[in-house]
Amino acid sequence: MSAFTPASEVLLRHSDDFEQSRILFAGDLQDDLPARLDTAASRAHTQQFHHWQVLSRQMGDNARFSLVATVDDVADCDTLIYYWPKNKPEAQFQLMNLLSLLPVGTDIFVVGENRSGVRSAEQMLADYAPLNKVDSARRCGLYFGRLEKQPVFDADKFWGEYSVDGLTVKTLPGVFSRDGLDVGSQLLLSTLTPHTKGKVLDVGCGAGVLSVAFARHSPKIRLTLCDVSAPAVEASRATLAANCVEGEVFASNVFSEVKGRFDMIISNPPFHDGMQTSLDAAQTLIRGAVRHLNSGGELRIVANAFLPYPDVLDETFGFHEVIAQTGRFKVYRAIMTRQAKKG
């Protein structure tokens, strides 16, 4: 989070307009402009734990991480700058939440890359804060309006649900594979051995489907799940509860909040952060796994076949196996050995 995103660069073209404003930054906060822009006061609210980590170091308690923003999170703000995410339902959840808290008359700015679908903000907010496009640059659009009417926000209405082989999966906007089990996770699940025992860590757990499916065939495993996404953390907790599966679930930037060692780490790691391609999380997962695996423990991940993970696995563990593959995906397995510990 050092260089500014194109969306932030568009905002900087209007920096003089914000000097007297008390701003709430929210949405897809990919850089630290909220901490650096010259304003009368700045707050930030994010559903992404890794974004909060960066911003809180500079903004302290004025940066908040949670699924749902509260009145305290928007206190004294007269302007909202919202970074449009790539996921429209996620934007609707966040904007309806924020606009239900901000006072009528609040200035509303929405900024995002054109390819993210930011133009749909006009229709989404038409009944609450009619928007006009005020700038277009760096393949981004900047929209401005004023809050005329607060929406009614009910987080419970945003929950979704689907079934996988008799299991109930609870989902929220912004959670990976919200509408059904993705092909990569299906492939990874096909490799899991029934009657496994020991401590299992599910990194980037999403809606928790990998963990509950594993637990059904291996009820003696002890589950820990983590994700950077507040919606994913809440969805995983709900999925575990719906299937009567026990496990600890918490927010973590890969291993940042993880304590102890495990017999198995499973993951379908992301390779996007917002609209940007990023292999950082997966590489951190692979390299950090050796500090969180017991001797003889294994890392098992699924990834798009074109992604360059074999070299990182070999550098870290000394070797790896491909235990399942299709034309698009591969499941990699690496074992914690003395050779890996030296790495």
From Swiss-Prot:
Cellular component terms, GO, for this chain's entry?
cytoplasm
A GO term, aspect molecular function: nucleic acid binding
- Asked if Hydrolase is a keyword of the record, the answer is no
Listed under catalytic activity are: guanosine(1207) in 16S rRNA + S-adenosyl-L-methionine = N(2)-methylguanosine(1207) in 16S rRNA + S-adenosyl-L-homocysteine + H(+)
Question: What EC numbers are recorded for this enzyme?
Answer: 2.1.1.172
Which compartments is it annotated to reside in? Cytoplasm
* InterPro entries in UniProt: DNA_methylase_N6_adenine_CS, Mtase_sm_N, rRNA_ssu_MeTfrase_C, RsmC/RlmG, SAM-dependent_MTases_sf, Small_mtfrase_dom
How this chain assembles, per its entry, is:
Monomer.
Please state what the protein is called: Ribosomal RNA small subunit methyltransferase C
Organism listed in the record: Shigella sonnei (strain Ss046)
